[in-house]
């Protein structure tokens, strides 16, 4: 059984060293924590509840946390991080 505990990187493949785990970004883009997925609905709920996790640009705009969903370059992660791509915000 996989040990889905501790720190991880969303860029690590597979996340947390096992395809049985998820890496949930925590505040910073390059650091997260490992967890056991308890089904697809829990991933969807996690994305809905986190202000910066997204699956689409529209989701970022609805959450008010940006207008661009930057997907992680990791095919084990079905989500990305919201950014504001407006040049005035830079």
Swiss-Prot record:
Residues 1 form the signal peptide. It holds the Pfam family Albumin_I_a. Residues 40-47 form a propeptide. InterPro entries: Albumin_I, Albumin_I_a. GO terms for molecular function: nutrient reservoir activity; toxin activity. The C-terminal glycine may be removed from A1b. Disulfide bonds join 4-21, 8-23, 16-34. Transmembrane segments: none annotated. Keywords: Disulfide bond, Knottin, Seed storage protein, Signal, Storage protein, Toxin. The presence of a 'disulfide through disulfide knot' structurally defines this protein as a knottin. A1b binds to basic 7S globulin (BG) and stimulates its phosphorylation activity. This is Albumin-1. It comes from Phaseolus angularis.
């Amino acid at each position: 059984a996989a040990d889905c505990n501790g720190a991880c990187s969303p860029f690590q493949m597979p996340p947390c060293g096992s395809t049985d785990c998820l890496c949930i970004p925590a505040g910073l883009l390059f650091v997260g924590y490992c967890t056991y997925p308890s089904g697809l609905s829990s991933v969807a709920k996690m994305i809905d509840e986190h202000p910066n996790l997204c699956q689409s640009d529209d989701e970022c705009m609805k959450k008010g946390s940006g207008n661009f969903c930057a997907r992680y370059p990791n095919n084990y992660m079905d989500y990305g991080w919201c950014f504001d791509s407006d040049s005035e915000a830079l």
